[in-house]
A protein has these predicted regions:
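Nucleotide-sugar donor-binding/catalytic module of glycosyltransferases
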Residues: 1-148
Length: 148
């Protein structure tokens, strides 16, 4: 028998969570499909451009929003490259019910996954505390180096 899973949270192998990430997210999952927390970044040598988390770009305050509010903010702030994998916790039963999976062998699968996940949600908990550190490194698909 497969274990009972309440929530799922993703992490890239070169990133890390704050020690209290899970403990902070679980109580906020009550009545929502997703908890969206903030991220900060660490740049490897050679990166000069700035990176801001999507949550900072949306400038949302802590609390529950409807999916429609997220969509309206996306349109009003002209945020067309939305991605979501490692910046939140997802209700696992909800994820199974909507049958959303990552697309194999394509770049930026987190964009497709994130947009569909948020579009199908009813409620999203905005948690503007930085619970995740994102390491931007050489040869990353984000490619923020000056050699663009």
């Amino acid at each position: 028998k497969a274990p009972d899973i309440d929530y799922i949270i993703f992490l890239d192998s070169d990133d890390y969570w704050e020690l209290n990430c899970i403990e902070e997210c679980v109580p906020r999952m009550d009545g929502v499909e997703v908890v969206w927390f903030d991220s900060c970044s660490i740049f490897e040598e050679g990166f000069k451009k700035q990176w801001s988390s999507l949550l900072k770009l949306y400038d949302l305050h802590e609390g529950v929003i409807k999916s429609k509010v997220w969509l309206e903010y996306s349109i009003n702030k002209k945020i067309y490259n939305f991605y979501f994998t490692w910046s939140g916790m997802i209700d696992f039963i909800y994820l199974k019910n909507i049958k959303l999976k990552f697309i194999d062998y394509i770049i930026h699968q987190d964009h497709h996954f994130g947009m569909l996940l948020f579009a199908k949600c009813k409620y999203i908990y905005i948690f503007p505390s930085s619970m995740h550190t994102y390491r931007i490194r050489s040869n990353s698909t984000i490619n923020l180096s000056d050699s663009e």
